[in-house]
Amino acid sequence: MMELPNGNCNGSSLNVCNGNGNLSNNDSLNWGMAADSMRGSHLDEVKRMVEEYRKAVVPLGGKGLTISQVAAVATQNTGVAVELAEETRYAVKASSDWVVDSMNKGTDSYGVTTGFGATSHRRTKQGGALQNELIRFLNAGIFGNGTESTQTLPHTATRAAMLVRINTLLQGYSGIRFEIMEAIAKFLNHNITPCLPLRGTITASGDLVPLSYVAGLLIGRPNSKSIGPNGQILNAKEAFQLAGIETGFFELQPKEGLALVNGTAVGSGLASLALFETNLLVVLSEILSAIFAEVMQGKPEFTDHLTHKLKHHPGQIEAAAIMEHILDGSYYVKAAQKVHDIDPLQKPKQDRYALRTSPQWLGPQIEVIRNATKMIEREINSVNDNPLIDVSRNKALHGGNFQGTPIGVSMDNTRLAIASIGKLMFAQFSELVNDFYNNGLPSNLTGSRNPSLDYGFKGAEIAMASYCSELQYLANPVTNHVQSAEQHNQDVNSLGLISSRKTAEAVEILKLMSSTFLVALCQAIDLRHIEENLKSVVKNTVSQVAKRVLTVGVNGELHPSRFCEKDLLNVVEREYVFAYIDDPCSATYPLMQKLRHVLVDHALENGDREGNSSTSIFQKIGAFEQELKTLLPKEVESVRVDVENGNPAVPNRIIECRSYPLYKFVRENLGTSLLTGEKIRSPGEECDKVFAALCDGRFIDPMLDCLKEWNGAPLPIC
């Protein structure tokens, strides 16, 4: 928007020419403003959003409103106060007075002296009555009273719409009194929310039907219903009394009804809520991808800055830098490197795409979401009705700013990005629970002693498939389903609110997926902790038994089998613990088979000495296995008990990682724990706790704490 120190005759900050008929701003097309709004990192922008969201007051002046401020007013009820900028009063009054003066002079203006839409050929001099009729015929929504289905727009979306509509009207181009905006602000500040229908708008000419119910409350229509701060149902009179509006119902002046309903505020308000959450969830998905790499023993080189610098896309570069920061210095990354060094053939040279290309996958989604955010922020600071009152040129401009195409397009794009994030999350989850891919974690992430009675996250994986399928369906565009409406006057329309509603649904599903994935990642972290403790005790026990049984012969002499210990320990080091630990000494499991294999190989190399019982390695095998069967199960059980009692010999290494704040939040603040078949608690109960935290914002601080040390740049290329 072009801003000049001296406003035009409307009293607003917008001007078109400098007095000589020349454009007064070299960014007259606003591309520079749009580009400037994208400066800095996405994470910094999210941090600013969170900071704004937590402020106690949202000042409204017709410009500078952000999606985070909309979300704050919409979701925090009386926790955030709305204040109208007094300096906007003059411009608002000027346009309102112009409408009245214009009608008194007999000027013919759409919606003031004419009918509406395709019937605008009709004429009347009863300006106030015309506005009342506008509200009456637009009250065409269905609420489903007496049925199980709810057809009412959510409370938060309605509050968002009210806030956005005030902001656009304050710019002084709509021909409406300042007192009406003050009344709407009082309803917001007293947490009184009119009931708006969920459906019935095509967001061109604006969100006519739902906004007519806000207008219906203001004029005291008998069918007007509101929800009070305690959930009580209020009629219009009760709502006015509770809000402290002493002037009584408004008698609409010419154009005021049209000014209230002919805007995109419902679609853009709900879009603001969806985007506020989406911006947070995409940062969460970056961190979850990094944690996924940690627990999967991934190779961190996929985040190397040179790779992403050569691709040039800023979203990808930032996603990689964030993951690189999480993985830098991670204990799991260091441990994985040791695994790769010991046996480079134990896993593929390259990690699978869901891990290795996660920055390339998430980067474009970040860019789409950022662009949609800026588009919606421009929309909620726009004048969206028709006609527009240009006091400075003494004319009413008949145009089409009510066309909510920026909402429909940005929401379609956002929904596609959300679906892509969910698809990546599902692919990562599927690898995590599959013991063929997860580098030693148990199948289904089972945590019990007996895997035959523990199927872990099998149900959660099925649920994730369901979530992902629905999310992919929702990714289909809304805006290509336009129907010609209102006697073919509204022959193209944006479907902005419908697209916003579908995007809000997609956000909910992504939260379901994110909460399930986060619980699974915490389970994997705990299983890595158990794995490390179990491997340690198995190595110690094998070492002790080897020293006791294999070092000396029957007469106390040094025995050739003493050289087997190193190779025996290498077997333990390389073998996945959860492949045998439920019955560590079973002859059908790989541990005992490979330990025996080592001893047999050494016996074959022992040559002629195998014929002598005092030097035969082969004859030691039975004693070694018997001793191991006596000791190892007891030691394994002892370690399990110690871990369960919070006294592990090896601490949980997540404490040493930058991802720890999120793990700590899930485990300590939300009270979740390792899921096993031996416990009563189900996966869904734990996922519900995390989902609630994603919905109410409690996850934000621990999420950002994971990145508090990041300086906003990738590690240098050395």
From Swiss-Prot:
<feature type="binding site">
    <location>
        <position position="356"/>
    </location>
    <ligand>
        <name>(E)-cinnamate</name>
    </ligand>
</feature>
<comment type="pathway">
    <text>Phenylpropanoid metabolism; trans-cinnamate biosynthesis; trans-cinnamate from L-phenylalanine: step 1/1.</text>
</comment>
<dbReference type="GO" id="GO:0045548">
    <property type="term" value="F:phenylalanine ammonia-lyase activity"/>
</dbReference>
<keyword id="KW-0585">Phenylalanine catabolism</keyword>
<comment type="subunit">
    <text>Homotetramer.</text>
</comment>
<dbReference type="InterPro" id="IPR005922">
    <property type="entry name" value="Phe_NH3-lyase"/>
</dbReference>
<keyword id="KW-0587">Phenylpropanoid metabolism</keyword>
<dbReference type="InterPro" id="IPR024083">
    <property type="entry name" value="Fumarase/histidase_N"/>
</dbReference>
<feature type="active site" description="Proton donor/acceptor">
    <location>
        <position position="110"/>
    </location>
</feature>
<feature type="binding site">
    <location>
        <position position="386"/>
    </location>
    <ligand>
        <name>(E)-cinnamate</name>
    </ligand>
</feature>
<dbReference type="InterPro" id="IPR022313">
    <property type="entry name" value="Phe/His_NH3-lyase_AS"/>
</dbReference>
<keyword id="KW-0963">Cytoplasm</keyword>
<keyword id="KW-0456">Lyase</keyword>
<feature type="binding site">
    <location>
        <position position="458"/>
    </location>
    <ligand>
        <name>(E)-cinnamate</name>
    </ligand>
</feature>
<comment type="function">
    <text>This is a key enzyme of plant metabolism catalyzing the first reaction in the biosynthesis from L-phenylalanine of a wide variety of natural products based on the phenylpropane skeleton.</text>
</comment>
<comment type="similarity">
    <text>Belongs to the PAL/histidase family.</text>
</comment>
<feature type="modified residue" description="2,3-didehydroalanine (Ser)">
    <location>
        <position position="205"/>
    </location>
</feature>
<dbReference type="GO" id="GO:0009800">
    <property type="term" value="P:cinnamic acid biosynthetic process"/>
</dbReference>
<feature type="binding site">
    <location>
        <position position="486"/>
    </location>
    <ligand>
        <name>(E)-cinnamate</name>
    </ligand>
</feature>
<protein>
    <recommendedName>
        <fullName>Phenylalanine ammonia-lyase 2</fullName>
        <ecNumber>4.3.1.24</ecNumber>
    </recommendedName>
</protein>
<feature type="binding site">
    <location>
        <position position="350"/>
    </location>
    <ligand>
        <name>(E)-cinnamate</name>
    </ligand>
</feature>
<feature type="binding site">
    <location>
        <position position="262"/>
    </location>
    <ligand>
        <name>(E)-cinnamate</name>
    </ligand>
</feature>
<dbReference type="InterPro" id="IPR023144">
    <property type="entry name" value="Phe_NH3-lyase_shielding_dom_sf"/>
</dbReference>
<feature type="cross-link" description="5-imidazolinone (Ala-Gly)">
    <location>
        <begin position="204"/>
        <end position="206"/>
    </location>
</feature>
<dbReference type="GO" id="GO:0006559">
    <property type="term" value="P:L-phenylalanine catabolic process"/>
</dbReference>
<dbReference type="GO" id="GO:0005737">
    <property type="term" value="C:cytoplasm"/>
</dbReference>
<dbReference type="InterPro" id="IPR008948">
    <property type="entry name" value="L-Aspartase-like"/>
</dbReference>
<feature type="binding site">
    <location>
        <position position="489"/>
    </location>
    <ligand>
        <name>(E)-cinnamate</name>
    </ligand>
</feature>
<dbReference type="Pfam" id="PF00221">
    <property type="entry name" value="Lyase_aromatic"/>
</dbReference>
<dbReference type="InterPro" id="IPR001106">
    <property type="entry name" value="Aromatic_Lyase"/>
</dbReference>
